[in-house]
UniProtKB/Swiss-Prot annotation:
It comes from Rickettsia felis (strain ATCC VR-1525 / URRWXCal2) (Rickettsia azadi). S-adenosyl-L-methionine binds at residues 78, 80, 103, 119, 143. Keywords: Cytoplasm, Methyltransferase, rRNA processing, S-adenosyl-L-methionine, Transferase. It is found in: Cytoplasm. The keyword Flavoprotein does not apply. It catalyses: uridine(2552) in 23S rRNA + S-adenosyl-L-methionine = 2'-O-methyluridine(2552) in 23S rRNA + S-adenosyl-L-homocysteine + H(+). Specifically methylates the uridine in position 2552 of 23S rRNA at the 2'-O position of the ribose in the fully assembled 50S ribosomal subunit. This is Ribosomal RNA large subunit methyltransferase E. The keyword Repeat does not apply. Belongs to the class I-like SAM-binding methyltransferase superfamily. RNA methyltransferase RlmE family. Transmembrane segments: none annotated. Its EC number is 2.1.1.166.
Length: 227
């Protein structure tokens, strides 16, 4: 599982215009068809190109180890849960391995991953996750993002609010020295949240994986070792 893209870069594929397709959907389709990470994910059996973002984060910060309990927020279509399952060797049926995934959208089952199709913001969802964990989590990770509308400031704020909710939840369920990973979009309003995170974790870093599209303002907040 490397990020070597040799053999995955195809010739540029043009997308024909269609009366039924909006400009934004045509642009998205064009990016997908010409994205080497999309092709690589398909060939290597990952649900999405986002899998490589988490692999890069782990390669940089060495977060995952066997016998961990992990919560994956905004899990669909399941790429991050797939990666986590491989990295903690969930297939060895260790009683200490546990991955709890949640999303509004349904995902195909993943071995050794317990999935709940729920709204994270519903009143009883946090308690459901806590009960399923049966103990404290080692990692809470969130790739949640709001549906983008193309207005950078609005997209930034909406995704930042999701990150804040994930952070507050992480404080409740993480064990001491646990880690928190979350997507944010750069836009200037994130500093207040970053200051909160720094008060609760010993090390806080920003990281933009090479598998993140260069034109995107997304970065990942990596908070290590909860106090």
């Amino acid at each position: 599982m490397t990020n070597n893209l040799s053999g995955y870069r195809n010739k540029f594929v043009r997308v024909k215009t269609s009366k039924k397709r909006t400009v934004s959907s045509s642009n998205w389709l064009r990016r997908q068809l010409n994205d080497p990470y999309v092709a690589k994910a398909r060939l290597e059996g990952f649900r999405s190109r986002a899998a490589y973002k988490l692999l890069e984060i782990h390669g940089k910060f060495k977060l995952f180890n066997p016998n961990m309990k992990i919560v994956d927020l905004g899990a669909a279509p399941g790429g991050w849960s797939q990666v986590a399952s491989k990295l903690i060797k969930a297939s060895d049926n260790s009683l200490n391995n546990k991955i709890i995934s949640i999303d509004l959208l349904e995902i195909e089952p993943i071995a050794e991953v317990e999935f709940f199709q729920k709204d994270f913001f519903e009143e009883n969802t946090e308690e459901l996750i806590i009960q399923a964990l049966d103990g404290k989590a080692d990692i809470v990770m969130s790739d949640m993002a709001s549906n983008t509308i193309g207005h950078k400031a609005t997209d930034h704020i909406r995704t930042l609010l999701l990150c804040e909710q994930a952070f507050e939840f992480a404080l409740k369920v993480l064990k001491p020295s646990g880690h928190f990973i979350a997507k944010i979009f750069r836009g200037g309003a994130e500093n207040e949240l970053l200051n909160k995170v720094k008060r609760e974790f010993r090390t806080v870093k920003h990281f933009k994986p090479s598998s993140s599209r260069s034109e995107s303002t997304e970065i990942y907040l990596v908070a290590l070792n909860k106090k």
